[in-house]
Each structure stands twice: as C-alpha cells, then as structure tokens.
C-alpha cells in the first residue's frame, strides 16, 4: 500500500505526517508540485509480459499524460531480486540529486521509495503497483529500490539526456532509513 511520511529534514526519527490514503497523499504532494495518481490497467498484465504488452494495458493513461506534459519517449524498466547488478543499480540513485526534466514513473508491479527534499522537509513516498509519481525537474530527491528490488515501471521522458542525475554532494540521504519493504507472509 502506498505511503507518505513527511519529516523535518533535521529529524529523521519522527514524521510530522504519515498516511496510506491515496487522496491524502496526493493532496500533500500537490502542495510541492508533485503529481500522485492511481491508475488501473485496461487489460491484465501478466508476469513476463513484454514492454509492448505493459504499455498497451495502460495506453489511455500513457497517451493522456504524454500529451499533457509533452513526453516524447516512454519505456519500461523491470528489475528483479535475482538481477546480478541489483546492488550497483540500487546504489546509483541513493544519494541526493536532481534531474533537468520531470521524473515520471508509473509502477506496474512491485515498489520503490522516492524521497524528496523540499523547503527543509523530507517527503518519503513509498510507491507501489498502480501508483504514478511525477517529480518536477530540479527537485532534490533520491530513490531506493530496496536490497531485493522487485518492480516494473513505465518511465516517461521529454529528452533522453535530461534524465541524467546531478548530485548535490550532501549527506542528507544517509540520515534517513533505507527502503526495506516488508515481504509478504507465506501461509504455513
């Protein structure tokens, strides 16, 4: 389930806001220019689906947001816990950075943690299946896919080179807990 926690950037121990309600999450994030939506597939997406099948299942929403925001390119990224480069991929965006274009991701499966640093606040957003998040260009943030990443996401771009991370060199991301999603309990 999606979750938003908001902290003072000097106090990673105690959230000032904590909600799993999608409407409440969207209402808080829109205050800092971030879009948060819940989408639903027009067709089921099965494990192992091709990128084309994934995009076809969400075609109406992809077309709508691409037209609204001027996206020229859409792709699908899929990362599984057994990926031999998972640690390298996780480490790539764990430090505070920004991009020169909006960072827009729709989670088809799995989860990840976007953490935004805006106006002396830290917004920790756990995105899960059916969540769309659009982080405006220039927003300081970091992303954690967890130690055993599992997600499939549709990514939107206006310019392929605009998505390069520009790192700030600050240590703030290290002050906040890393993402450790709870594993589903197995029936005994």
Swiss-Prot record:
Reactions catalysed according to its record: 1,2-dihydroxy-5-(methylsulfanyl)pent-1-en-3-one + O2 = 3-(methylsulfanyl)propanoate + CO + formate + 2 H(+); 1,2-dihydroxy-5-(methylsulfanyl)pent-1-en-3-one + O2 = 4-methylsulfanyl-2-oxobutanoate + formate + 2 H(+)
Similarity remark: Belongs to the acireductone dioxygenase (ARD) family.
Function according to Swiss-Prot or TrEMBL: Catalyzes 2 different reactions between oxygen and the acireductone 1,2-dihydroxy-3-keto-5-methylthiopentene (DHK-MTPene) depending upon the metal bound in the active site. Fe-containing acireductone dioxygenase (Fe-ARD) produces formate and 2-keto-4-methylthiobutyrate (KMTB), the alpha-ketoacid precursor of methionine in the methionine recycle pathway. Ni-containing acireductone dioxygenase (Ni-ARD) produces methylthiopropionate, carbon monoxide and formate, and does not lie on the methionine recycle pathway.
Record's subunit section: Monomer.
E.C. code: 1.13.11.54, 1.13.11.53
Gene: mtnD
Binding site for Ni(2+): 97, 99, 103, 141
Source organism per UniProt: Xanthomonas axonopodis pv. citri (strain 306)
The name this protein goes by in its record: Acireductone dioxygenase
Cofactor (UniProt): Fe(2+); Ni(2+)
Keywords: Amino-acid biosynthesis, Dioxygenase, Iron, Metal-binding, Methionine biosynthesis, Nickel, Oxidoreductase
